[in-house]
Amino acid sequence: MILNRQKKVPLAEQPLSEFLGKILQELNFAQAEVSIAFVSDAEMAKWNRDFRHKNGPTDVLSFPALSKRRADRHAKRKDAVVKSPVTAGGFLGDIAIAPQTARRFARANGRTLDNEIRILMLHGVLHLMGYDHESKSDLGQMNRIEQKLRRRLGLA
């Protein structure tokens, strides 16, 4: 489900909803549900402060429905990208994306806003599945999986 709660950056919700479906299908989660809210920088800054104790907006936040322990167990599986955990078909969680921040990052990285938003959607879904980048080994694992999926999904 896509919910656009901001007005500063125009978004085409239907193509983004379809792309979310492609991400979930690629991960063998076609029946799973994810909600993505596009929020203002001000709202994202508040959430970033409340949930991560960091000042200012970030580009994406994920709020997994899976317990951390079960998500970690799934993320450590070698076949995690192609095998669904017990929760497949259920609600994976919520993702918040700040399009204004995404637009700044897109410009800085030479990408289109549409491409940046899709990359953030993928990144957020991986977090919902338990992947993380808090340690070097976690970062390496998540980056490998994300790069593989970016290629499969046609993202630069």
Label every model-predicted segment.
Residues M1-R118, L126-A156:
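An acidic/histidine-cluster motif and surrounding catalytic segment
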